[in-house]
Amino acid sequence: MAQVQYYGTGRRKSSVARVRLVPGDGRIIVNKQDIREYIPTEALIEMVKQPLVLTETLGSYDVLVNVHGGGFAGQAGAIRHGIARALLQVDPEFRTVLKRAGLLTRDARVKERKKYGLKGARRAPQFSKR
């Protein structure tokens, strides 16, 4: 018999996460590693679990993630976004809870490009009056 799977794609900064939810005991596997091995800080791990905690589905699904691009914070945000989207396929009733927490909205903030003539995106060279 085919196993039930739910898919969700999450994005944050330059990271893209493809998330699969499979009925299981709550393991989170990121790029074939346990989440505790892959993501270094506890705060980011809690951030990833947020959609599961809000919908009270923390122990009922195994989360299988393939993520690339960006750093740890961006990847954690992308995983969280992907999990939230996958949970919508599990039960459309979760939409109100996830939307209220802001987990369904793609965080569009990305690093602003450096402009020529400036030292950074907005930082101007030091001004000398004379």
From Swiss-Prot:
Q: Does the keyword Glycoprotein apply?
A: no
Which N-terminal stretch is annotated as signal sequence? none
GO MF terms, alphabetically ordered: RNA binding; structural constituent of ribosome
Instruction: Give a Gene Ontology cellular component term annotated to this protein.
Output: cytosolic small ribosomal subunit
Q: Which InterPro entries match?
A: Ribosomal_Su5_D2-typ_SF, Ribosomal_uS9, Ribosomal_uS9_bac/plastid, Ribosomal_uS9_CS, Ribsml_uS5_D2-typ_fold_subgr
**Translocase is among the record's keywords:** no
What does the record list as GO biological process? translation
Source organism superkingdom: Bacteria
Sorted UniProt keywords = Ribonucleoprotein, Ribosomal protein
Family statement: Belongs to the universal ribosomal protein uS9 family.
The protein's name: Small ribosomal subunit protein uS9
Upper lineage is: Bacteria, Bacillati, Bacillota, Bacilli, Bacillales
